[in-house]
């Protein structure tokens, strides 16, 4: 059940990276319609040092834009790695997304996905300087057997220049567990309205993990998203694709590194951030499936470059059907 909950919540969060519809019922939003995820494409990429990376991911299901002041190009490489991972994994789960005029977000998806992602292929990228070929990536894409999600899992609206997605948490829990969770609405509201220390204690108890190290600002941000909706950005790219994404301000609390007060075997300070703490707790609680646990290393990679990050956009790359 935990595995299904993880994948369902991940799917809903991916759906939540887009939204559209104006609060004025007299206006028809230009975003209403059905969208496919962008086609996975790649080309050889030549670095300034005259080195070439084969099959460099150009487009795919995941949109990334990472600007930085670091002298080397490590963040640029990680950004391409994200495009590869998102472009490889999301098409194994998601077929299309419909923005309903009534305000619902509806997806055609794989109910119980079997994700094909060999961790050794990621390691190989670092050692060989080449990404898998487009044909190898597309070989695992799902083309049939999709399920249509209920209408009430997530809703969208446009407010103050942002596209806001409101998750229906009881409905999501009902879909994930198969048991009616509609009566949990008041309980969930009480938890989300609690002070950060109470929320950390409750979540820590559920996961059997210590979450006291997470900043109060991060807890307030997450509970605000759960109660009031997730504010996102949307734009039409030069190639006509629709990019729906969270920007750097959404990630600052999560990725900024700080010292734990401990030192490693080399006498250097041990650093952490809130997303590392939360991810490790989800892994320890059995919420993150085994095949997805290695993704934690990318949280550390991003955190290591966050102090030199000037712009960071992460979301979906979509094409109107």
PLM features: residue spans?
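Bacterial Sec-dependent N-terminal signal peptides
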Residues: 4-5, 14-41, 308-321
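Tryptophan-anchored aromatic micro-motifs
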Residues: 28-66, 70-73
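Intrinsically disordered, low-complexity coil/linker segments enriched for acidic/polar
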Residues: 195, 288-289
